[in-house]
């Protein structure tokens, strides 16, 4: 077919998600002897709590984004604005890390930190998450993408409106979101 290679905006690959039980197993792991794994888990859980927020968006979050019990930010990829209620469990994660930059998380130290820094860190976190996933006896490799897919999957199960899921994922249409949800495998 002549249009076989035309990209329609969403790759039709199976997107793997994990259920609430698996998330609980990840949370319950004792990682006190493995700070690097604990950090990777924190990033994963925070992404999950922040509606599957991407690693790059998390990297650029600052204290200015937090106001009146809400986190408000603009997605780097789409410019879409998101407003998420800030929960105690998110604060607990943030409080573990030093406050020596304007950023909420110890990912970037300044604006000049380039894509390479973020890419390298993202790779390392995914490598560590795979180990966390194995320790939690997950049936799939744990990655940052799994947080995004799992949030969407759980939101769908809880019958959260498609429009809300669509906004959170930064999709430009609900049709895109419906296609995305149909590719989720839990």
Report the location of each language-model feature.
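Short, basic (Lys/Arg/His-rich) helix/loop patches that form interaction surfaces
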Residues: 28-35, 126-167
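Basic, Lys/Arg- and aromatic-enriched nucleic-acid-binding interface segment
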Residues: 2-55
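Acidic donor-binding helix in nucleotide-sugar-dependent glycosyltransferases
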Residues: 56-57, 164
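Conserved tyrosine-mediated DNA breakage-rejoining catalytic core shared by Y-recombinases
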Residues: 2-5, 50, 60-96
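Catalytic-site neighborhood detector that most strongly recognizes the C-terminal catalytic loop/helix
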Residues: 9, 17, 75-79, 169-186
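Active-site/catalytic core of tyrosine-dependent DNA strand-transfer enzymes
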Residues: 17-24, 87-139
